[in-house]
From Swiss-Prot:
Name of this protein: Chorismate synthase
Chain positions recorded as FMN binding sites: R130, S131, S132, N251, A252, G296, K311, P312, I313, P314, T315, R337
BP term (GO), one: chorismate biosynthetic process
Organism: Streptococcus pneumoniae serotype 4 (strain ATCC BAA-334 / TIGR4)
Pathway assigned in UniProt: Metabolic intermediate biosynthesis; chorismate biosynthesis; chorismate from D-erythrose 4-phosphate and phosphoenolpyruvate: step 7/7
Cofactor(s) of this protein: FMNH2
Gene giving rise to this polypeptide: aroC
Length: 388
């Protein structure tokens, strides 16, 4: 399974193409749109979310509510494009129109300046448009397809925010994936501890009044994972490594950890390793899950627990100093639309990329052209694992 996304933030549409999804997977536009709505939601979102009402359109690969095995093509229309017809025109336009929204003031923390140097642009809008987090719309769409596949294999996935700008959220112990998903969905800030809800919302309001932004930490949990996804035989086949790349590829994400993560560096080995248990009913399990569901780069059957660190959104309404690329004079950076935080939305993106990588691994290990054969192969593997 592989995929590509295309499109610009203010272009006419966003597109994704997925190849390798087995035939026979039940799939509707609403399966995708539900996750797109969640990506646009969350307390603290800004004006762009009021303009766009993202709806996916299938143009190939799905017929009568099921995948055909052919490449799946999905489009999402950018409604805001109508205000940018000249600026984002694919055809050449007059110089006076080109300069209308030309960007020469790179924003600190964005791809603007480095992209301009790399691709030799004199208008940094070219960098801004593709590097925008608007691209994650299609990664959420791809992830929604992957999640439908995982659900058919009795795997479940959820995300929630565990840190808001330095404010840690207390997470009740032993919550199931379903409970995490339910609690986070009921929260405007995607947390599982409802007692902290108003405190976090008040904090976001204050950050907005200050013209500033905050980052934080998002956790994704996956249950029902088969043993043995990934491999130790080569460095690039380790599943936790692939997941780490996927998470850090999300806009503004700067770090990733599994299970205890960096805390493991402060503990003794006896306090970190997960003791192995066995019972006739459950087969092999672990006493704890400090390693986040991985041993040797492979899934061990415990829930996958992965966290991503998101830096504060770099676009500030109190812009930082920058330098004009034409005059080299100091200048306050260009201000585009921004939000005080996008952590709840970022959680949806993280959930999507994790689901996508897991679907890729499933299809690599249990290669099948149709859903029926795939389900049979996974069920057979689960039986073997239990009786090993």
């Amino acid at each position: 399974m592989r995929y590509l996304t295309a499109g610009e933030s203010h272009g006419p549409r966003l597109t994704a193409i997925i190849e390798g999804i087995p035939a026979g997977l039940p799939l509707t536009a609403e399966d995708i749109n539900e996750d797109l709505r969640r990506r646009q939601g969350g307390y603290g979102r800004g004006g762009r979310m009021k303009i766009e009402n993202d709806q996916v359109v299938f143009t190939s690969g799905v017929r009568h509510g099921k995948t055909t095995g052919a490449p799946i093509t999905m489009d999402v229309i950018n409604k805001d494009h109508q205000k940018w017809l000249d600026i984002m025109s694919a055809e050449d336009i007059e110089d006076r129109l080109k300069s209308k929204r030309k960007i020469t003031h790179p924003r600190p923390g964005h791809a603007d300046l480095v992209g301009g140097i790399k691709y030799r642009f004199d208008d940094l809008r070219n960098s801004l448009e593709r590097s925008s987090a608007r691209e994650t719309t299609m990664r959420v769409a791809v992830g929604a397809v992957a999640k439908r596949l995982l659900a058919e294999l009795d795997m479940e996935i959820a995300n929630h925010v565990v840190v808001f700008g330095g404010k840690e959220i207390d997470v009740p112990e032993n919550l199931t994936v379903a409970e995490i998903k339910q609690r986070a969905a009921q929260s405007e800030v995607s947390i599982v501890n409802q007692e902290r809800e108003q405190e976090i919302k008040d904090y976001i309001d204050q950050i907005k009044r200050d013209g500033d932004t905050i980052g934080g930490v998002v956790e994704t949990v996956v249950g029902g994972v088969p043993v043995g996804l990934g491999s130790y035989v080569q460095w690039d086949r380790k599943l936790d490594a692939r997941l780490a790349q996927a998470v850090v590829s999300i806009n503004a994400f700067k770090g990733v950890e599994f299970g205890l993560g960096f805390e493991a560096g402060y503990r003794k080995g006896s306090q970190v390793m997960d003791e192995i248990l066995w019972s006739k009913e459950d087969g092999y399990t672990r006493r704890t899950n400090n390693l986040g569901g991985f041993e040797g780069g492979m899934t061990n059957g415990q829930p996958i627990v992965v966290r991503g660190v998101m830096k504060p959104i770099p676009t500030l309404y109190k812009p930082l100093m920058s330098v004009d690329i034409e005059t080299h004079e100091p200048y306050k950076a260009t201000v585009e639309r921004s939000d005080p935080t996008a952590l709840p939305a970022a959680g949806m993106v993280m959930e999507a990329v994790v689901a996508t990588v897991l679907a890729q691994e499933i299809l690599e290990k249990f290669s099948s052209d149709n859903l029926e054969e795939l389900k049979e192969a996974v069920a057979k593997h689960r039986d073997y694992t239990k009786n090993y």
